[in-house]
């Protein structure tokens, strides 16, 4: 398994490198068969107003799946401990879900929500403000998947949303975590309405 450690506003010393390597080796030792690459990004915020100055982000690439975790604290070593525990839990969950014994079939349900029109006064007289320029572009592979598979990926990447190619409709969809609990899916609709 390939391990890449990068630092932002911090020099990655040999002791930090060894500590990260030992913690992640311990966290990923049972998952060596499907984890191919691990990226670690350590950063220190030089801002007095930020309480959790030391942040550790770990991204594990496993069988075409991205599993990501990030933690921050006042101590770099504590952040590394927290993120390694979190990534170990996520890897265990991924392994149990995809490689565990399936003894029973769980019935999957879904609910179709009514399509209510958006009120005209939602934005008011404000004009939406967009950034003046694109500062970063990302490209990634987008294999077709079901909404349930996209939900699983959303939970693994530790983000608020996940964009995917819907296997059923062959359209790009976004699944997101709702503020009031649960998940939502944004699907494109052709036409003006």
UniProtKB/Swiss-Prot annotation:
The keyword Cell wall biogenesis/degradation is assigned to this record: no
Entry's induction text: Is repressed by light, since the transcript is synthesized in the dark, but upon 20 minutes of illumination, transcript levels fall below detectable limits. This light-repressed transcript is present only in dark-adapted cells. Is rapidly translated at the onset of illumination; in fact, is one of the first proteins to be synthesized upon illumination of dark-adapted cells. Repression of the transcript in the light requires protein synthesis, which suggests that a specific protein is directly involved in lrtA light repression.
Keyword terms of this UniProt record: Cytoplasm, Translation regulation
Organism superkingdom: Bacteria
GO function term, MF aspect, one: ribosomal small subunit binding
Name used for this protein in its record: Ribosome hibernation promotion factor
Functional note: Might modulate either transcription and/or translation.
Coiled coil: none
Disruption phenotype: Knockout mutants grown in continuous light appear to be the same as wild-type, showing no differences in growth or photosynthetic activity.
Cellular localisation: Cytoplasm
Lineage summary: Bacteria, Bacillati, Cyanobacteriota, Cyanophyceae, Oscillatoriophycideae
Gene: hpf
UniProt cross-references to Pfam families, sorted A to Z: Ribosom_S30AE_C, Ribosomal_S30AE
Gene3D superfamilies associated with the record: Ribosome hibernation promotion factor-like, Sigma 54 modulation/S30EA ribosomal protein, C-terminal domain
One annotated GO biological process: negative regulation of translational elongation
InterPro entries: HPF/YfiA_ribosome-assoc, HPF_long/plastid, RHF-like, RHF/RaiA, Ribosom_S30AE_C, Ribosom_S30AE_C_sf
Family: Belongs to the HPF/YfiA ribosome-associated protein family. Long HPF subfamily.
GO cellular component: a single term: cytosolic small ribosomal subunit
Subunit text: Interacts with 100S ribosomes.
Comment field (misc): The transcript for lrtA is more stable in the dark than in the light: a 3-hour half-life is estimated in the dark, whereas a 4-minute half-life is observed in the light.
């Amino acid at each position: 398994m390939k391990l890449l450690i990068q630092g932002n506003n911090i020099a990655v010393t040999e002791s930090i490198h060894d500590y990260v390597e030992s913690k992640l080796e311990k966290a990923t030792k049972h998952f060596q068969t499907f984890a191919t690459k691990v990226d670690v990004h350590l950063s220190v915020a030089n801002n007095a107003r930020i309480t959790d100055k030391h942040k550790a982000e770990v991204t594990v690439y496993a069988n075409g799946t991205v599993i990501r975790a990030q933690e921050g604290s006042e101590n770099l070593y504590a952040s590394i401990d927290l993120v390694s525990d979190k990534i170990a839990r996520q890897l265990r969950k991924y392994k149990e879900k995809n490689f565990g014994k399936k003894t029973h079939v769980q019935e999957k349900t879904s609910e179709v929500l009514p399509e209510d029109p958006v009120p005209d006064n939602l934005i008011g007289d404000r004009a939406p403000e967009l950034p003046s320029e694109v500062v970063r572009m990302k490209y990634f592979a987008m294999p077709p998947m079901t909404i349930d598979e996209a939900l699983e990926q959303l939970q693994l990447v530790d983000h608020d949303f996940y964009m995917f190619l819907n296997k059923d409709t062959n359209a790009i969809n976004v699944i997101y975590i709702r503020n009031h609990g649960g998940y939502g899916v944004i699907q494109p609709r052709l036409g003006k309405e």
